[in-house]
Amino acid sequence: MSHLKPKIMTGAYDAEKLRRNLQEQIALEEDELENQTDFESNKEESNINNNPLVIKQEPSIYPIEINLEDLEKANGMEEDWENSLMKIIESSDVTPKLSWNDEFENCTYKGYVVSSEDLCNDSGNQEKNEVPIKQSSLEDVAQVLSLFQIRSEVDYKIEKDNKNQVKIIKLSKQDKSVKSKRNDVVNQDSDKHMKYDSNFDAVMDQFQKGIRIKKRFGKGYVKINADNMPGTYHDLSNVISTVKGEKTVEEMIRYLFKKSKRFKSINKTLNIDEMILC
C-alpha cells in the first residue's frame, strides 16, 4: 500500500527574496494602474477640448516672483537690487508722459506738417492763421463766416493754389488798408440798417394810424390798422427788408399786399389802387 501514501515535499525558502518579489509585484501593479488613469484623463481632456459646447477656461496668469539674488548676479551688481527693480517698474509703464513740444514736434495731421510754434497763438506781430479748404467748400464757408459778421477782404483774404484748394488767411488788424476797408463796409451796413429801420418804422407808424382801402365788390372802404392787420410784425419785417430803392409809405404798403402771403389773402376783395392813409 506504499503507492497510496502521499509524498511529502519539503524544502528551504528565502523569506527576504519573497518579500522583495512581493514589493516588486505591488509596484508593477501600481505603475500599470497609474498609467491607465493618466491615459483615461488625457482622453477625457481631449474630448472636452474637441467639444464645441464646452466653454474653455483661459489659463490663469500668476505674478512672477523675482529672486533678488539672481537679479543681482544677472546684473553684476552687489546689494543694488532696489535700483534694478525700479528700472523694471519704469520700463513696464505703458503710458509714458510726453511734454507738449515732444508730442507735437513735427507731427503731421492729414498731410500738413504741424509744428509746436504754429500751435501757439502768441507769435508776436506775425499771425499765422491759415485754414486750407477745398475749392468746392469755399462758398459754404464764406456764407457761414458772413453770419458772424466776418467779411472777405476785410477780416480775411483768400489765396488759391494748384491743388484745388484755397487758403483762408486772417488779416491783421494793424493793416491800414484793411482798417479803411473795414470802416467802409461797416458804414455801408449801418446805412442799410438805418434805411431798413426807417422804412419799417414808417410803415408801422402808418398802421398805427390806420389805412382805408376801397372794397372791390360793393360800396365803402375797409379800415385796417395795427390791431386787425392780417400779417404779423415778423412777416411785415421780412417783406419790408426786401424793398429796393426809395419808396413812399403808400408804395411800401402796396408792395406788402403783393408779397406777403397774409396780406395777399385779403387782396382779392380789396382794390389797393384806391387807398387812403389816415
UniProtKB/Swiss-Prot annotation:
Keywords, alphabetical: Chaperone, Host cytoplasm, Phosphoprotein, Viral RNA replication, Virion
GO cellular component: host cell cytoplasm; virion component
Source organism: Bovine ephemeral fever virus (strain BB7721) (BEFV)
Subcellular location: Virion; Host cytoplasm
Modifications after synthesis and translation: Phosphorylated by host kinases.
Gene: P
Function summary: Non catalytic polymerase cofactor and regulatory protein that plays a role in viral transcription and replication. Stabilizes the RNA polymerase L to the N-RNA template and binds the soluble protein N, preventing it from encapsidating non-genomic RNA.
Full protein name: Phosphoprotein
Subunit structure: Homotrimer when phosphorylated. This trimer is stabilized by binding to the L protein. Binds soluble protein N, and ribonucleocapsid.
Main location (coarse class): virion
Keyword Transmembrane helix carried by entry: no
